[in-house]
From Swiss-Prot:
This is Prokineticin receptor 1. Belongs to the G-protein coupled receptor 1 family. One of its GO terms (cellular component) is plasma membrane. The chain crosses the membrane at residues 63-83, 99-119, 147-167, 180-200, 233-253, 283-303, 323-343. PROSITE patterns: G_PROTEIN_RECEP_F1_1, G_PROTEIN_RECEP_F1_2. Expressed at high levels in the heart, skeletal muscle and pancreas. Expressed at lower levels in the brain, lung, liver and kidney. Disulfide bonds join 137-217.
């Protein structure tokens, strides 16, 4: 039966064309959301293929992606955990913007502690061989995909919230029920769109040179479903990249016009000027986050489009796998940038960590719940300008 071979994670996929050609007698369709081509069409005899995992370029790429995964586990794991803990403890942080940021934090935290260790084993330790079974293969693939879409949808929701708060300040702010519905929509849309990533993910035993076996973990689409695959990819590309980027760009362009190019009527007090400076800094930070998102993910989507719709471009490229690793590392680094911008910098995570540790240290083992609650209230975070900046009310 002809198959299409996808890769580990729809947002961190791989296509190892050098050893996929071992599927002799089959038409391999490879890609994050795979495309169709036959190795026989390009006269690539099996005995001329080499195991790219033993090359120097692959070794260098393995080191790079290993460093990226370690960085994600440390930055996203620790930073997002502290932010989520602080948000649970301090009520003054629970505004709409921070709740939307919490969606980013939760999704990136799950990827850092659940997916990254398995990917480290797959990419670096076992050099492109999966040893953890079909269920974990599909689960890791699915969680990575959901995390990407949650991040995209949350960034879009934050942009819309800033637009409404700054361009239409007299309109009532979003109620708790509406905010809960928005958060539910962010997750439900991401979960539904990512279902094919889990449904088509499976394991495939591949035999490379010298009869060495590699267990490939990724999406495998039947060749006769090529039209549906490409339609699905274009749908995802439009809904989870092009559409959100255009919408966020329009929102921040309108907000920037409001903050920088529109005269404020009346006499400007020091408090008004301080709030204006605060809003400008926050919007600049959000624009930087949007720019980082585009710079990190545009190469990945562009690489995927060329690979999936114009396979002849890469099929004989010697350093194709190394190029993919570079593109993938750039895309994965976006989660670290989000954590540093939203969690560590904007919310001063170290201050929250010190307060949480002090609270635990001061609470005696025999202390009552009432005294612990009093301790929590007395160590609450003051309404500083930094907190006002993130709230932007």
């Amino acid at each position: 039966m002809e198959t299409t071979v996808g890769a580990l994670g729809e947002n961190t996929t791989d296509t190892f064309t050098d050893f996929f050609s071992a599927l002799d007698g089959h038409e391999a369709q490879t890609g994050s959301l795979p495309f169709t081509f036959s190795y026989g069409d390009y006269d690539m005899p099996l005995d001329e293929e080499e195991d790219v995992t033993n090359s120097r370029t692959f070794f260098a790429a393995k080191i790079v992606i290993g460093m990226a995964l370690v960085g994600i586990m440390l930055v996203c794991g620790i930073g997002n955990f502290i932010f989520i803990t602080a948000l649970a403890r301090y009520k003054k942080l629970r505004n709409l913007t921070n709740l939307l940021i919490a969606n980013l934090a939760i999704s990136d935290f799950l990827v850092a502690i659940v997916c990254c260790p398995f990917e480290m084993d797959y990419y670096v330790v076992r050099q492109l061989s999966w040893e953890h079974g079909h269920v974990l293969c599909a689960s890791v693939n699915y969680l990575r995909t959901v995390s990407l879409y949650v991040s995209t949808n949350a960034l879009l929701a934050i942009a819309i919230d800033r637009y409404l708060a700054i361009v239409h300040p007299l309109r009532p702010r979003m109620k708790c029920q509406t905010a809960a519905g928005l958060i539910f929509l962010v997750w439900s849309v991401s979960i539904l769109i990512a279902i094919p990533a889990a449904y088509f993910t499976t394991e495939t035993v591949l035999v490379i040179v010298e009869r060495q076996e590699k267990i490939f973990c990724g999406q495998i689409w039947p060749v006769d479903q090529q039209f549906y695959y490409r339609s699905y990819f274009l749908l995802v590309f439009g809904l989870e990249f092009v559409g959100p980027v255009v919408a966020m760009t329009l929102c921040y362009a309108r907000v920037s016009r409001e903050l920088w190019f529109k005269a404020v009527p009346g006499f400007q007090t020091e408090q008004i000027r301080r709030r204006l400076r605060c809003r400008r800094r926050t919007v600049l930070g959000l624009v930087c986050v949007l720019s980082a998102y585009v710079l990190c993910w545009a190469p990945f989507y562009g690489f995927t489009i060329v690979r999936d719709f114009f396979p002849s471009v890469f099929v004989k490229e010697k350093h194709y796998l190394t190029a993919f690793y570079v593109v993938e590392c750039i895309a994965m680094s976006n989660s670290m940038i989000n954590t540093l911008c939203f969690v560590t910098v904007r919310n001063n995570t170290s201050k929250y960590l010190k307060r949480i540790l002090r609270l635990q240290w001061r609470a005696s083992p025999s202390g009552s719940k009432a005294s612990a609650d009093l301790d929590l209230r007395t160590t609450g975070i003051p309404a500083t300008e930094e907190v006002d900046c993130i709230r932007l009310k």
